[in-house]
Amino acid sequence: MRALVVSMAVLLASIASIATQAEPRQFTFSWPFEEGDALRPRGGTTRGAALTLATEPSAAWRAVQEAGLSKFERDRRAILAMAGGYRTSFDFLETVGFTPGFQPSRPYQSWGTEYIYVVEDTGAFIRLQHLMVMFVADREGKVQGPFVQKHWRQDWRYEDTDLHVFIGRNRWVRQERTADEARGRWSQAVFQVDDSPRYEALGEWEHYGSYSAWTSERTARPLPRRETTVRDDYQILEGVNRHTLTPTGWVQEEENLKLVLDAQGQPAADMPYLARELGVARYEHLVDFDFSAGDRYWQRSGGFWRDVRAAWDKVYAERDTFEYLEEAGGQEMFVPLFEYADRLDNGEAYDAAAAAEVIRSTFARHLR
């Protein structure tokens, strides 16, 4: 079956229409005295096709453990060890409230199967692209798919001194760091499905035998889709990320604060923070999963997405500050970009001039 390459909204709607409700999800770490199901987790409710998880340590993980490596090379291998095919799970839970009469929002849980490609590796710079490839069981247990979705991207740069950070109200600014601040550290820049920026921060890898983890500085980011669809009472998700390798995958942990800005774009004086949230995303290596639809999508559309990244690079090089509107004229930025990439995946030849016009017109609507 030809892969269905769709937008995030269409993907979720398509999957929901054929979904079988999963077994009740666990509240292992939650609010035990809340009555009823007001805190029943929201998010994905589908079941995927049968999967086989890896049980033996990966070659990439073993490569990180090799004796005699320089710190730089061990860092690099740890980043590269995040590539590959995974079952992913996402859990987010408010754990502490700072407002009178605080009521925690519903926890969020979801899942996916995705492949992480090494798009670029020049030594001190590594680019990883996530691509979701999902097979979903319908109510009768029949497997539907594959559904293909370009997901997020992470760029890693060694001793980076030129960052772009979010300051709220759709605004981004250049942040220059000193060589001393960057020494021995890696920046991680995270990008959304349309390659627009999400957050960027410096952090340092630590390696102790079988333990390898990178921890970021506190960084601000726009509200994620899982929040913008249900609330608008705060403006910045401010948090610390930790990426930890495991023998059969990796885990991303987040500790986030939900920050309110005043009309001047400053933290609200009386009550800047609403709540603290913990997040855990687990990436578990898969064995013998068919990611070929994702391979084909990336082979056919990768040149277009390279040009999209180049357009963003031009923005970063030329502007110390810019405003990015995720939605403009009733349309989100990813829509025309996904539509053109879908045409390429369906066999249309890449037309550099046509692609350039799609990119130009899209950026003109969404950047200020």
Please describe what each predicted stretch is.
Residues T215-A263, Y273:
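Extended serine/threonine-enriched, polar tracts that run as long, contiguous segments within proteins
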Residues P104-R106, S110-E120, E238-L245, D270-M271, ...:
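Hydrophobic/aromatic beta-strand elements that line small-molecule binding cavities or substrate pockets
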Residues S7-I15:
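Bacterial N-terminal signal peptides
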Residues T178-E238:
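Short helix-loop boundary/capping segments
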Residues E120-W152, W156, D160-V165:
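Extended amphipathic alpha-helical segments with heptad-repeat/coiled-coil character used for oligomerization
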Residues L80-G84, V118-A124, R242-W250, H285-D290:
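A short, structured loop/turn motif at beta-sheet edges
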Residues A22-A81, E94-T99, P104-R106, F125-R127, ...:
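Amphipathic/hydrophobic helical signal segments and adjacent flexible N-terminal regions
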Residues M1-A3:
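Positively charged n-region of N-terminal signal peptides that target proteins for export
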